[in-house]
Design a protein with these regions (language model features):
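Bacterial Sec-dependent N-terminal signal peptides
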Residues: 1-26
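Long, low-complexity ectodomains and other extracytoplasmic segments of secretory-pathway proteins
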Residues: 21-47, 53, 114-163, 172-173, ...
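Surface-exposed binding patches on compact interaction domains or structured appendages
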Residues: 28, 58-90, 174-202, 290-320
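Short, solvent-exposed loop/turn segments enriched in Ser/Thr/Gly
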Residues: 34, 45-51, 98-107, 159-166, ...
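Short edge beta-strand/loop segments characteristic of extracellular beta-sandwich folds
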Residues: 51-57, 166-172, 208, 282-286, ...
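Short, acidic/polar linear motifs in exposed loop/turn regions
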Residues: 57-60, 99, 114, 172-175, ...
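Short, hydrophobic beta-strand segments
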Residues: 91-99, 205-213, 321-329
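C-terminal soluble interaction/assembly domains
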Residues: 280-288, 293-301, 305-344, 348-358
Length: 360
């Protein structure tokens, strides 16, 4: 009886995991994944195939209108008949694997009846002439689990979205490796499959970021690997993502009548400065829209920086803000620093400004 209870609990946990692993593509449509990673494949092994499964969670039929591959090296087939509520459809792709011994990243652009924007699916992998040792293919080691890199990118997402991706990881040991994660950043989900990872084998590490209105612009999400119960605090996985406002549910008229900043200059010329000096750059703008303009976040690609507060700007009003760049940690020579504003403007949700100069 005890074993039966454990079996039922295990089955429930597995079912719960599988349900949570579904990726929401839009209102009423989910997928089992948006990225398929083939890992390392031999160049002479021939074509490789995968399948994406879509589930209709709405109360109306959904039609896959078209699936377009990013190159002629990938053939695609999909469910042509309407997908009824609660039912599933499939998109199958075959990569020719004849482009040479290189990494590949192919995109399938999917057009469906229920979603205005096209859905992007990815096929990834590395085609190799001869298999390399795991230690060489996955140079970043944390205990017995190995990665190609510890710096991952989840891309851009809008508020209300969940963005997912996946990479391959390896088990360097001669026995199965159980993998879990701790100290996981809020809004990040991360898991490995299969788990445990077979001895001297590979697995897919899937991760997803859920947009949160407390996080805007550039963000980092962290996770610490735990292998066979041992925590590895010496290194952590870092996942980058960029979050912007969502305007998908507003009309074209509302977009055109929304806030619209117009900057006097998009580039501040700092001229020649000495290394260690602080550059002070002021950017002025006018809100030519019909609603108040606001900035959710300012990101600056420099080691040491600060900026003044950007107060809400009413229609027709002018405003300005100042950015300070400490050049102590910047290399000598030409500099070009990007200042990125994440805003509430439907026409300019992202504004890039620049600080140019020369550091002696």
């Amino acid at each position: 009886m005890k074993h039966l209870h454990l079996y039922i609990l295990s089955a429930l946990l597995m079912t719960s995991f599988q349900l949570s692993a579904q990726v929401k593509l839009g209102e009423g449509l989910e997928a089992d994944k948006t990225v398929h990673n083939f890992g390392d494949i031999k160049l002479d092994s021939g074509p490789v195939s995968c399948t994406f499964t879509l589930t209709n969670t709405s109360d109306k039929p959904i039609v896959i209108y078209q699936v377009v591959s990013s190159c002629g090296c990938t053939d695609v087939e999909w469910t042509k008949e309407p997908i009824l509520p609660g039912k599933k459809g499939k998109i199958s792709a075959t990569y020719s694997n004849d482009e040479g011994p290189y990494p590949f990243d192919k995109t399938l652009t999917v057009y469906v009846s229920s979603i205005k924007k096209p859905i992007l699916l990815k096929l990834r992998g590395v085609s190799v002439e001869k298999p390399k040792p795991l230690e060489e293919s996955y140079p970043e080691h944390i205990g017995q689990i190995a990665f190609r890199t510890l710096e991952l990118n989840c891309g851009n997402l809008e508020q209300g979205e969940v963005k997912s991706d996946a990479v391959m990881v390896a088990n360097l040991s001669n026995s199965p490796l159980n993998v879990s994660f701790e100290d996981i950043s809020p809004d990040l989900d991360i898991s490995v499959n299969p788990n445990p990872i077979p001895a001297r084998g590979t697995a897919e590490m899937s991760f997803s970021v859920t947009a949160n209105r407390s996080r805007w612009g550039k963000n980092k999400y962290w996770a610490t690997p735990v292998t066979n119960g041992k925590s590895h605090q010496e290194k952590r996985i870092c996942i980058h993502a960029f979050t912007r406002e969502s305007f998908k549910n507003i009309s074209e008229n509302d977009k055109s009548s929304g806030p619209r900043p117009k900057f006097d200059e998009s580039t501040f010329q700092a001229g020649k400065v000495r290394k260690g000096d602080v550059i002070k750059a002021t950017f002025s703008f006018k809100n030519e829209g019909k609603k108040a303009f606001g900035v959710y976040k300012v990101d600056i690609d420099a080691p040491q920086w600060a900026h003044s507060r950007i107060s809400p700007t009413e229609p027709g009003a002018k405003n300005s803000f100042t950015v300070e760049i400490d050049t102590s940690d910047l290399p000598e020579g030409e500099m070009l620093t990007i200042v990125t504003l994440t805003t509430n403007s439907p026409l300019r949700p992202i504004v890039n400004l620049f600080i140019a100069g020369w550091i002696d």
